[in-house]
Amino acid sequence: SKKFQTLALGATLALTTAFTAPAMAGKDFIKKDLSADLPLSKKKVLITAGPTYEPIDPVRFISNPSSGKMGFAIAEAARDAGAQVTLISGPVHLPTPDRVKRIDVISALDMHQASMDALNQTDIFIATAAVADFRVENSHNQKIKKQDNSGPGMTLTLVENPDIVAAVAQHEPKPFTVGFAAETRDVENYARQKIERKNLDMIVANDVSRQDIGFNSDQNAVTVIWKTGLQAMETASKAQIARDLVTLISAHYKKAR
């Protein structure tokens, strides 16, 4: 009868609600519980990546071959470790990782400003960007023509860019600060000098003169140095190096706090 069908339907809906709601609640509980166990859960991580362009005129600039691949890989690894990640990127040809906030910049001055603006409540700062040390003092608003020069050559006056990672390390409260040292010789020695001079917690050094792990390579090999020790990471994909770095950084961050 219609009355029986109505009662049966009501009972079915009641049973469905009774069993579905707790089941879904259980899934949410498990998801939250797993998230809480991640090493960087609820931590804010700020990462710089890629090169910077220092303009000479509207069509020429000073830069370097950095691809940004290492920084983007670290952003993904930090996100997977539970962090809230902000990625400040120079000009690169890479897609934005899912669930990562990306801020695009061009010059070293842009990156410095963006880093200081985003630094509030940052727990960990990782400076992978290959920032140009110098910029042209007076860049031209119009393209420079050959005939504009009175002689056979042209002289550019360069001025020093702000040291972003050193500025971050001086900030109060200071985030756990990780620098990168891309060197072509005496890699470990130069890295140790930087960690002291810039008051860093850790530094990641690599030899960019090697063709197999250079700027645009998909692989890397690094030595991670801190004030009381070091750890070498042999050649592997940048994704794997990134995961290993995030594991090591999170462990040292917890010890420091």
Task: Map each language-model feature to its residues.
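Phosphate-binding loop/pocket of nucleotide- and phosphate-handling active sites
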Residues: 229-257
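Glycine- and acidic-residue-enriched helix-capping/strand-helix junction motifs
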Residues: 57-69, 147-148, 153-161, 236
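C-terminal segment of classical bacterial N-terminal signal peptides
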Residues: 4, 15-23
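Generic hydrophobic/aromatic pocket-lining and core-packing "Φ" positions
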Residues: 59, 71, 75, 115, ...
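Bacterial N-terminal signal peptides that target proteins for export
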Residues: 1-8
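Glycine-rich phosphate/dinucleotide-binding loop and adjoining beta-alpha-beta core of small-molecule
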Residues: 27, 79, 84-214, 232, ...
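Internal gly/pro-rich beta-alpha loop/helix module
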Residues: 27-34
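Glycine-rich phosphate/diphosphate-binding loop of Rossmann-like nucleotide-binding domains
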Residues: 37-107, 119
